[in-house]
Each structure stands twice: as C-alpha cells, then as structure tokens.
Amino acid sequence: MARITAEDCNKIIPDRFRLVVLATRYAKLLNYKVETNHIKKEKLDKPPVIALRRIAAGKVSVAQLEQDLINSLRTRTMIEPLVNQDESEAVEEKFEYLPEVYIGEDYSDLDDQIFIDEHGEDYETDK
C-alpha cells in the first residue's frame, strides 16, 4: 500500500493547516457516507487516508469543500436586530419594581449565614 504524505497534497493545498481542516471535513463526510462511490481498493482504507489521496489526486473540489465547511460552521438561526430603541428602554424600566435589598452590593445578608469549613465544622461569619 502506497503511503500518502502531506507533500503530495501540498501541490493542491499549499497551507498545511488549511489542508488538515479540509481533509478532516472531507473525511467526516466520507465517514457519514455522504459520498458513497468508493472504489474497491479504497474500501479497506480509513476515511482520512481516502480524503488525503483524493485531495492529492485532484479529485476533490477544494472550493466546494471550503464552502461546505463554512456553511457547516455558520449559525443556523439569525438574530434579528432590535428595530425600535424604545422597546429596549421599556424592558429596562420593567425592573424598577425591585426593592433596593435585591440590588445592593454590600453582601450583608451573608453575615449571619452558617458555613462549613474544609474540616466539616460549622462556623458563623459574624464571629
């Protein structure tokens, strides 16, 4: 069995990082059986080897593979921009009903709490 090396693929994709990313994507597609037209001798090889061989032979469209990778990494849902600025201000105003106790930053409510230290003994914070 002939060994495929990165130097064989560098003629098609000169950047090694890009080669690894695209070969990985193509190997995953082969593994998920997206492409089922395997040649008989390729059935014995693992998907990464098949992917590297096909990239080195020029049988894979690099541009199509890049576009497929980009599409797979995109988010599926689009976030709609806030149309009206007044709506965001109205949301902020809805929280004005909270008393100051919940908004404070002094953490005084922890002073009378009982905590357990690393030895399993209880102690109070106001001692």
From Swiss-Prot:
UniProt-recorded Gene Ontology molecular function terms: DNA binding; DNA-directed RNA polymerase activity
Keyword annotations from UniProtKB, A to Z: DNA-directed RNA polymerase, Nucleotidyltransferase, Transcription, Transferase
Class of the enzyme per the UniProt entry, highest EC level: transferase
Gene3D superfamilies given in the database record: 3.90.940.10
InterPro entries: DNA-dir_RNA_pol_omega, Pol_omega/Rpo6/RPB6, RPB6/omega-like_sf
Keyword Transcription carried by entry: yes
EC number from the UniProt entry: 2.7.7.6
Catalytic activity: RNA(n) + a ribonucleoside 5'-triphosphate = RNA(n+1) + diphosphate
GO cellular component: DNA-directed RNA polymerase complex
GO term, biological process aspect, one: DNA-templated transcription
Recorded superkingdom: Bacteria
Summary of subunit composition and partner proteins: The RNAP catalytic core consists of 2 alpha, 1 beta, 1 beta' and 1 omega subunit. When a sigma factor is associated with the core the holoenzyme is formed, which can initiate transcription.
HAMAP family: RNApol_bact_RpoZ (MF_00366)
Protein family membership: Belongs to the RNA polymerase subunit omega family.
Free-text function comment from the UniProt entry: Promotes RNA polymerase assembly. Latches the N- and C-terminal regions of the beta' subunit thereby facilitating its interaction with the beta and alpha subunits.
Designated name of the protein: DNA-directed RNA polymerase subunit omega
